[in-house]
């Protein structure tokens, strides 16, 4: 065959899976965002080559300082934060009595957040409803099983 098409030349040069990509779209996007000259290769002798070598370690060190002190994986870090007990916020000396009163109202006087729907400060030491008088959930279940109560089929 005497004449070859452009696709034949492309196949001969790089094969069917050429590593060279058509960067026309990328060039257009670069021009659009104004980064056309940001990837220029410096000519020999015009710009020192050590500039890029010196900049890489400094950026690496800056990123190392921002990392966590411990080398925990993100999963371990997540579970440590989830399983640790929640701490009440540190109360600083308030400038006015009003802001201190608001903080006490929100967090309660002993540093524990009040339950939703509780008026004033709730006593968390009382625990479950009916703990002393025997009207809790388990007590009511056992009372259902007493003889003479319940449905006639169970008597």
Curated annotation (Swiss-Prot):
Residues 37-49, 123-134 have a biased composition (Basic and acidic residues). Keywords: Acetylation, Cell membrane, Membrane, Phosphoprotein. The modification N-acetylalanine is found at residue 2. The keyword Amino-acid biosynthesis does not apply. GO terms for cellular component: myelin sheath; plasma membrane. It is found in: Myelin membrane. InterPro entries: Myelin_BP. One of its GO terms (molecular function) is structural constituent of myelin sheath. It is a peripheral membrane protein. Its main location: membrane. Residues 1-72, 113-155 are annotated as: Disordered. It comes from the Eukaryota. Belongs to the myelin basic protein family. This protein may function to maintain proper structure of myelin. This is Myelin basic protein.
């Amino acid at each position: 065959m005497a004449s070859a098409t452009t696709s034949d030349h492309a196949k001969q040069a790089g094969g069917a899976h050429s590593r060279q990509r058509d960067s026309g779209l990328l060039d257009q996007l670069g021009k659009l965002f104004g980064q056309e000259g940001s990837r220029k290769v410096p000519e020999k002798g015009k710009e020192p080559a050590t500039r890029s070598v010196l900049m890489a370690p400094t950026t690496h060190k800056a990123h190392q300082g921002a990392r966590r002190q411990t080398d925990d994986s993100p999963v371990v870090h997540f579970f440590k934060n989830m399983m640790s007990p929640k701490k009440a916020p540190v109360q600083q000396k308030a400038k006015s009595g009003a802001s201190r009163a608001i903080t006490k109202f929100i967090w309660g006087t002993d540093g524990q957040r009040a339950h939703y729907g509780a008026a004033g400060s709730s006593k968390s030491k009382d625990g479950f409803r009916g703990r002393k008088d025997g009207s809790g959930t388990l007590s009511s279940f056992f009372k259902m099983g007493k003889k003479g109560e319940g449905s006639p089929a169970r008597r």
